[in-house]
Amino acid sequence: MREYLNFLKYIKENGVLKGDRTGTGTRSIFGYQMRFDLQKGFPLVTTKKIHIPSVVHELLWFLSGSTNIKYLNDNNVRIWNEWATVDGELGPIYGKQWRDFNGQGIDQIADVIQMLKTNPNSRRILVSAWNPCVVPSEKISPQENVVKGNSALPPCHAMFQFYVANNKLSCMLTQRSADAFLGVPFNIASYSLLTHMVAQQCNLDVGEFIWSGGDCHIYNNHIEQVNEQLSREPLALPTLKILRKPNSIFDYKYEDFEFENYNHHPAIKAKISV
């Protein structure tokens, strides 16, 4: 994934120093796009190890509509723990907005599947996780926001749109805030996986995954790790194999996915900014 290394390098060389909500500080750029041909391999970063169970379980959790971390913790995924209440609640985050937007019974995922099957040329095949009604206040903690009925965090990956051409399904993700070192590799993998799943459900081949970022940043305490990653040579991409076709997009299990030939460099640890 040379595209991803070029992204890191561009931010490192062109980013401006900015403060941020966490107090860590960043090097930041505004506006960047990467394109991945899903016919040429699954875009899983190889210059460091990506924890595949976290990617898959988080996506299945989103699709379930759940906003409690119990499922994730039961599967040894703890990427959301810092923001949850003592009861494991995160408020109306991604899954809630995807499956029951604003609590009004609007299932955006089911609607997208139906539109792809019945009107694939539509330019309205999209899902938005951004709901201004529940955007949290920056003046109080994530947990306090949840108590007030808001989400613990606003969605970073805010909207995604599907596009069909030549019987191939492509997906474009718009990400308002992009943690380039820790977050973006997960986001690329997650939405590429979702594109494969939706394509299977709609009897389509996969096309491209397009990632578009707004505020793209490297945290100041990740610079050393970024330099380490940039020194590594990318390896061949793995291949995703989906072992069965469930009855619906909501019926996939972790065991349904196999990432063949995922060769990678060692993991690089970095502290997440809360």
Curated annotation (Swiss-Prot):
GO terms for cellular component: cytosol. InterPro entries: Thymidate_synth/dCMP_Mease, Thymidate_synth/dCMP_Mease_dom, Thymidate_synth/dCMP_Mease_sf, Thymidylate_synthase. Keywords: Cytoplasm, Methyltransferase, Nucleotide biosynthesis, Transferase. It catalyses: dUMP + (6R)-5,10-methylene-5,6,7,8-tetrahydrofolate = 7,8-dihydrofolate + dTMP. Pfam families: Thymidylat_synt. It is found in: Cytoplasm. One of its GO terms (biological process) is dTTP biosynthetic process. Pathway: Pyrimidine metabolism; dTTP biosynthesis. DUMP binds at residues 21, 123-124, 176-179, 187, 217-219. It is an enzyme of class 2 (transferase). CDD domains: TS_Pyrimidine_HMase. (6R)-5,10-methylene-5,6,7,8-tetrahydrofolate binds at residues 51, 179, 273. Its EC number is 2.1.1.45. Coiled coil: none annotated. The active site is at 156 (nucleophile). SUPFAM superfamilies: Thymidylate synthase/dCMP hydroxymethylase. The keyword Cytoplasm applies. GO terms for molecular function: thymidylate synthase activity. NCBIfam families: PRK01827.1-3, PRK01827.1-5, thym_sym. Catalyzes the reductive methylation of 2'-deoxyuridine-5'-monophosphate (dUMP) to 2'-deoxythymidine-5'-monophosphate (dTMP) while utilizing 5,10-methylenetetrahydrofolate (mTHF) as the methyl donor and reductant in the reaction, yielding dihydrofolate (DHF) as a by-product. This enzymatic reaction provides an intracellular de novo source of dTMP, an essential precursor for DNA biosynthesis. Homodimer. Belongs to the thymidylate synthase family. Bacterial-type ThyA subfamily. This is Thymidylate synthase.
